[in-house]
């Protein structure tokens, strides 16, 4: 074997184990077999490729379940759903609210359970449960039954998004994460966009077998989700230190390299033994609350679009119900472009704060376009068409911006938090505040304000001005901390750690 003296990795496990900065034991290796720098880089590239294909693919599909419910409910809202279930007044918003509350309550224990149970059985079980409950929604007869089913839906899906965010963050180095979160978001929004097309087709089955169109949406997509849940058991991968438990994934050498490269990046590949004290102590970190508030602000906007876009297009832009479902699709397909592009730039140049700020400004511009009154009276069809086109274009800009910021915020958080339980706790906490944003977002779109939707527009604009302020505050704080680190201060109990901004 040729010797490249740049970087060597030893692969024979020692009988001894080192203790990392968090107190957890980490496997060390002796000099029985060395890898040169070129061989190391080749293995790293191979591991990334395999992990992208196995983990990011299934994680993207499962993350789309976050939007599956909103896509079906949004599409159903312009069909006979309201009259069939007597969803009068604020009952539609309550159905969103109660779903979110159930999800918030169970997010922390469900995220911790990923470690207890293991990713494969855990995600397979909750995905199958989510699909089964979605299928059962097709047969509810009253709004009260709808509320009860949506509580169960919220519980079932509470562990999906924060759990997957946590799992993905354990497999990639900090500079690789934003693009991988972009893959997740791309799969999520592409599935939502495709779901609108599927919902359009299923709505055409209205009356078949005695079922309304919206019931067909829940029935078919619930069945598909159950199948995905079964497949997940074999497709999903375990944590890096347990990679050998995954079906047909990494070789023994690749598994060791996967562990070693994460350990070299941030020194927390193996978690401490679980204690609730080690989870709850992380709530003393003020960064957790800053990240949580930013997710809250972002989800105010995303909920308004995810659950209400067909209604906004129907009432605000005066299209038919089926046209509204179809026209809800293009903004989400478009969103794949900015999220992948900005995330590629973020990982390439190690940028986080500037991209979050840029995306927030784009969202503000999109909402102002959407809420813009006619510049001139629409006394001609040409003027009216231009105004509709301007407002519809605003939905593209806003959708692309908020989807891009999901990936950027995930990477921003994961890059600046060290420790397995701390990252699990932070992921669950921000997901809970994300859910609180859903509650707020479900009430800012008011049909009586059509076509301008002033409350939705100005709440979204204000939330993202505040987000920019928090990012600036974090950037200054991280800069000062990194300067102290250069002077010898150890950050987050990890030698060599520096904040990313």
Give the predicted meaning of each segment:
Residues 69, 85-86, 109, 117-118, ...:
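Helix-breaking motifs and short loop linkers at transmembrane-helix boundaries and internal kinks
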Residues 178-210, 219-225, 427-441:
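Glycine-rich segments within core transmembrane alpha-helices of 12-TM secondary carriers
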Residues 1-66, 79, 89, 233-268, ...:
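Intracellular terminal tails of multi-pass secondary transporters
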Residues 74-75, 277-343, 406, 410, ...:
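Extracytoplasmic gate region of multi-pass secondary transporters
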Residues 121-135, 354-369:
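Structural signature of the two symmetry-related core transmembrane helices
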Residues 105-144:
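Conserved MFS/SLC helix-loop-helix module at the cytosolic interface between two early adjacent transmembrane helices
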Residues 54-89, 110, 195-199, 297, ...:
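Extracytoplasmic
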Residues 105-118, 337-351:
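Helix-to-loop junctions at the C-terminal end of transmembrane segments
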């Amino acid at each position: 074997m040729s010797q490249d003296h740049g970087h060597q990795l030893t692969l024979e496990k020692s009988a001894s184990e080192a203790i990392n900065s968090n107190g957890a034991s980490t496997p060390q290796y002796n000099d029985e077999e060395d890898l040169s720098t070129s061989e190391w880089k080749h293995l790293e590239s191979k591991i990334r490729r395999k992990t992208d294909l196995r983990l990011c693919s299934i994680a993207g599909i499962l993350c789309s379940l976050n939007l599956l419910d909103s896509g079906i409910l949004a599409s159903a809202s312009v069909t006979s759903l309201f009259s069939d279930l007597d969803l009068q007044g604020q009952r539609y918003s309550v159905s969103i609210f109660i779903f979110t509350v159930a999800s918030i309550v169970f997010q922390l224990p469900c995220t911790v359970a990923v470690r207890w149970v293991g990713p494969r059985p855990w995600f397979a079980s909750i995905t199958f449960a989510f699909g089964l409950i979605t299928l059962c929604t097709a047969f509810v007869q009253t709004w009260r039954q709808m509320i009860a089913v949506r509580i169960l839906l919220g519980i079932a899906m509470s562990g999906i998004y924060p759990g997957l965010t946590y799992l993905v963050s354990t497999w990639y180095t900090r500079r690789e994460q934003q693009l991988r979160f972009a893959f997740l978001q791309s799969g999520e929004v592409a599935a939502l966009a495709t779901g609108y097309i599927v919902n359009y087709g299923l709505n055409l089955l209205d009356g078949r077998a005695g079922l309304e169109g919206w019931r067909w949406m829940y029935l078919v997509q619930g069945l598909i989700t159950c199948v995905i849940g079964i497949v997940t058991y074999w497709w999903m991968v375990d944590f890096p230190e347990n990679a050998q438990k995954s079906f047909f994934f990494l070789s023994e050498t690749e598994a060791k390299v996967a562990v070693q490269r994460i350990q070299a990046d941030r020194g927390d590949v193996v978690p401490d033994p679980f204690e609730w004290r080690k989870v709850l102590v992380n709530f003393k970190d003020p960064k957790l609350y800053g990240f949580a508030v930013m997710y809250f602000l972002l989800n105010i906007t995303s909920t308004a679009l995810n659950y209400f876009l067909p209604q906004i297009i129907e009432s605000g832009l005066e299209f038919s119900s089926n046209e509204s479902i179809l026209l809800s699709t293009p903004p989400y397909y478009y969103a794949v472009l900015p999220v992948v592009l900005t995330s590629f730039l973020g990982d390439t140049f190690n940028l986080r704060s500037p991209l979050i700020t840029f995306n927030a400004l784009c969202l503000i511009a999109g909402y102002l376009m959407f809420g813009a009154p006619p510049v001139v009276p629409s006394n001609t069809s040409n003027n009216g068409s231009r105004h509709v086109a301007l407002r519809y274009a605003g939905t593209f800009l806003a959708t692309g911006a908020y989807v891009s910021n999901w990936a950027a915020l995930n990477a921003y958080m994961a890059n600046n938090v060290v420790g397995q339980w701390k990252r699990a706790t932070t992921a669950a906490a921000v997901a809970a505040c994300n859910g609180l944003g859903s509650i707020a977002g479900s009430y800012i779109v008011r049909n009586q304000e059509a076509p301008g939707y002033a409350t939705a527009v100005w709440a979204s604009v204000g939330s993202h001005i505040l987000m920019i302020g928090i990012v600036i505050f974090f950037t200054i704080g991280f800069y000062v901390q990194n300067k102290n680190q250069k002077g010898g201060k150890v950050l987050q109990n990890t030698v060599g750690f520096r904040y990313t901004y």
